[in-house]
Amino acid sequence: MNVTLLIPARYGSSRFPGKPLAPINGKPMIQHVYERASLAKGLTAIYVATDDDRIKEAVEAFGGKVVMTDPQAASGTDRIEDAITQLGLKDDDLIVNLQGDQPLIDPISIEQVITLFERHPGEFSMATLGVEITEKAELDDPKHVKMVFDNNFNALYFSRARIPFGRDTNDYPVYKHLGIYAYTRSFISTFAKLPLGRLEDLEKLEQLRALEHGHKIKVAISAFDSPEVDTPEDIRICEARLAVD
């Protein structure tokens, strides 16, 4: 099975312009993401998908591969669709979509979503990761997306609100969604053609489109948190963790 990992990276960000190139312990963030991803077993190729020449130059400077995407791409999914079309990937090729703001991603987490497709072929459309929340501040923070799943680890819902809600107790696990997906090339083409979902629009969570249209998302639970960098303040947290990693 051919497995291509794509790292979508945009230079423009209202909260953190130039985020992929933000230095973390002397390297641009996108390099940390790329190098950690390259440690995962089972990958055929890794590419950064970007529409910005500055990111392209930075990636090529450390020896990474880049595919340039349409700057008019309306969403991350459209950018991925553009990239896989340019790369000429086949319908049954597996795509791993890793967000470019996860410099602490653990390679084992990437291997987990690949393993789901190897062990359960044809049983679901997408695979993703969750991790149990251990920091209380994250429970009610909308930037940390929560998730619930059934007894077979099929996702039931994703929300910026705390889910599930314990009516009589707060003593129960809550899981956070990690920004990594896996799907076949044929599914992402199908997904890109689906109309915007009502819940997707409310929560501003693209994965809800799949659930709203009846597609299954299989979940693996990771032992490793991989916090995303959303603001310049998050850089200091990453630097501290990388220093002891």
Curated annotation (Swiss-Prot):
Belongs to the KdsB family. Transmembrane segments: none annotated. It is found in: Cytoplasm. This is 8-amino-3,8-dideoxy-manno-octulosonate cytidylyltransferase. The keyword Oxidoreductase does not apply. One of its GO terms (cellular component) is cytosol. HAMAP family: KdsB (MF_00057). Its EC number is 2.7.7.90. Coiled coil: none annotated. Pfam families: CTP_transf_3 (PF02348). GO terms for biological process: lipopolysaccharide biosynthetic process. Keywords: Cytoplasm, Lipopolysaccharide biosynthesis, Nucleotidyltransferase, Transferase. Pathway: Bacterial outer membrane biogenesis; lipopolysaccharide biosynthesis. It comes from the Bacteria.
